[in-house]
Amino acid sequence: MSGRQIIGIHGLANKPEEVELAEFWHSSLQEGLEKNSGINIDALPFTSVYWANVLYPLPDTNYDAYRPAPAGALKTYEAGTLDSIRAGVGDVVGNGLDWLKEHFNLGALADGVLEAKLNDLSRYYEEEAIRDELRRRLRNTLLDHDGESIMLICHSMGTIIAYDVLRELGRARPNFRVAHLITIGSPLGMPHVKRKILQEWRTARTPTNVDRWDNLADKRDPVAIDVYLRGDYKANGRGVEVRDDLIFNDWGGINHKSYGYLRCPEM
């Protein structure tokens, strides 16, 4: 896989040590390739962009370690089996968490994730030094692999950081390209996030430097409140549109875990 690079950026809340999280992502991707496609690659060309230590002074020690999926657990999404109508989504700020709890019957686990999301998002948007550092880490990693065929996989809040960095690079480095952008469990459809994007970039569209954009979402994932981003983000000037794909996240809990997304058949 010479000349190709997979770059991953994690999402909300605190995380385990940097090396450990990278190993968990790598193992999840390997498992998905082997079980879903019969492809066995010992060492994927994978680089992890880690930013949890900007927001949290110490790594998380009470975390979900990667574990292989039970036999038969990795399934494609079957239309209708998980459907629940999510219409009229309100803004997830202020009492937005109460709105989500009332309409989607979210339990305590989902509450905690959403509260972490709101806190992390608030700091990203309100504290310039934090925002600049998170963007810098991803931007530098992307530019380190300029000229290679880059697959950029972003989870949760990492999709917001990635979107902003790609829009920045579209202006600053017009020849830079990402061959494949994959957003998983993304909050890019949240009204509050879309407003911030419009405030900074004036338009919501596929970044000009992206050749392909796939958005994977589980309808049970409360962070991916809007599973269909195509209606929110226009095509770029080369006609590249976001392609939405519903998936079945086998991890359980609130079905937001990155490992479940990374090993799903649609990935």
Model-derived segments and spans:
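Lipid deacylating catalytic domains
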Residues: 1-52, 56-63, 96-153, 157-267
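A basic- and aromatic-enriched beta-loop-alpha substructure that forms the phosphate/nucleotide-
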Residues: 54-102
